[in-house]
């Protein structure tokens, strides 16, 4: 794993202030992995969970999947996302979603464009455009533990971390947290009714979904 994944890291990750944000989020989110979990890794910041699973030794104790069909192995990140290194098996996407739709996952790691005070998530409607929801709704609706991985703000955010201390060097001009999301990709009300565990992991803190909305459960050193 290490030889290939580190080689891919060097060409697929742009080392910048933004990669620091992704690293902080990915490291914290990866702590939600449990031995024998069957896991879905979403595109974007959630890809970092795979890398920290590798670094912590959890990669050999869980089964990572991506919606394109790979099961087991190490998901490739960046522009090649969807491919798997050393996959145990590869199915077509329709069969992969049979696994997802029938509750075959233990935990999923997904991105988010907006989150509101109730815990609803918009993952498909951006400013002036519809990105498309893809398999997001299927995966998040049936998975017992859902971990959203996203930055607290966007557009211009710059973050550094030294010795575990997080510093916001420049705040982003767009807040990901809003009173009401533009469109609901993930329903907090339905998640509560289904008994799902839902976390919202950012580069500065972690929230958990409760029947009363979002509850702040962690604040990182320096914030």
Regions found by a protein language model. Give the residues of each.
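N-terminal active-site beta-alpha-beta segment that forms phosphate/nucleotide-binding
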Residues: 5-88
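Conserved phosphate- and dinucleotide-binding cores of soluble alpha/beta proteins
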Residues: 1-13, 77-223
């Amino acid at each position: 794993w290490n030889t290939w994944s580190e080689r891919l890291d060097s060409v697929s990750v742009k080392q910048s202030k933004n990669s620091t944000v992704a690293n902080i989020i990915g490291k914290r989110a990866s702590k939600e992995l449990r031995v024998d979990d069957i896991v879905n890794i979403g595109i974007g910041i959630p890809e970092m969970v795979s890398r920290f699973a590798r670094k912590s030794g959890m990669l050999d104790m869980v089964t990572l999947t991506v919606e394109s069909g790979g099961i087991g192995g190490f998901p490739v990140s960046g522009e090649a996302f969807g491919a798997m290194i050393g996959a145990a098996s590869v199915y077509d996407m329709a069969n992969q979603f049979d696994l997802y739709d029938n509750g075959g996952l233990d935990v999923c790691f997904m991105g988010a464009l907006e989150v509101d005070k109730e815990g609803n998530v918009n993952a498909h409607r951006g400013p002036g455009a519809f990105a498309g929801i893809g398999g997001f709704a299927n995966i998040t609706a049936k998975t017992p533990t859902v971990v959203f991985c996203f930055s607290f703000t966007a557009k211009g955010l710059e973050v550094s971390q030294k010795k575990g201390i997080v510093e916001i060097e420049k705040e982003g001009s767009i807040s990901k947290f809003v009173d009401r999301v533009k469109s609901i990709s993930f329903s907090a009300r339905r998640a509560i009714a289904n008994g799902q565990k839902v976390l919202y992991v950012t580069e500065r803190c972690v929230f958990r979904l409760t029947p009363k909305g979002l509850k702040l459960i962690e604040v990182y050193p320096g914030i």
